[in-house]
């Protein structure tokens, strides 16, 4: 079992740190689990450059299909973020007629280290199992620009990949 290391950092708003991470490491692999500062939304988690990803697609009996629940049973320790779709139930309810889905039934990534923000008390920590990775991220953040661009780029909707069309999505929701 890897020991979790946690180090307090000076408080900075999550949006500032996310901008730094994106500038340092790129946007691909950047995760932001947001909160609103309420009792249920106290925490924000940021991570970048996943050290591992797991993706399962397909239904039982299909060529190349992989069981998402079996994948979950064999995860290494760490901070995992992602999703398990409703269609993953095809592996536990094989008698039901499950529709094929272009989206993975499981997609998760492990980030080490992560940054944890307590919005209520304005505390910030870096957490991870690899002290060298923690030090490297701290060093990178210490030298990265801290100002947000005054002219931020809009969300590049044309760069998004749509895995289903509008009709396929609507049918999958039904």
Locations of the language-model features?
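Signature of the chorismate-utilizing enzyme
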Residues: 1-174
């Amino acid at each position: 079992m890897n020991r979790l290391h946690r180090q307090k950092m000076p408080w900075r708003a999550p949006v500032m740190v996310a901008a730094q991470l994106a500038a340092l490491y790129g946007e691909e692999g950047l995760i932001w689990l947001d909160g609103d500062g309420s009792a249920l939304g106290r925490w924000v988690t940021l991570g970048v450059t996943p050290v591992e990803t797991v993706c399962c697609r397909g239904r039982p009996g299909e060529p190349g299909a992989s069981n998402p629940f079996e994948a979950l049973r064999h995860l290494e320790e760490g901070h995992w973020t992602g999703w398990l779709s409703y269609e993953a139930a095809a592996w536990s309810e094989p008698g039901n007629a499950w529709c094929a889905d272009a989206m993975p039934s499981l997609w998760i990534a492990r980030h080490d280290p992560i940054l944890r923000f307590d919005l209520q008390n304005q505390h910030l920590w870096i957490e991870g199992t690899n002290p060298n990775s923690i030090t490297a991220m701290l060093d990178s953040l210490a030298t990265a620009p801290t100002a947000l661009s005054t002219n931020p780029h809009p969300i590049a909707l044309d760069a998004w990949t749509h895995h289903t069309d509008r009709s396929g999505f609507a049918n999958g929701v039904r």
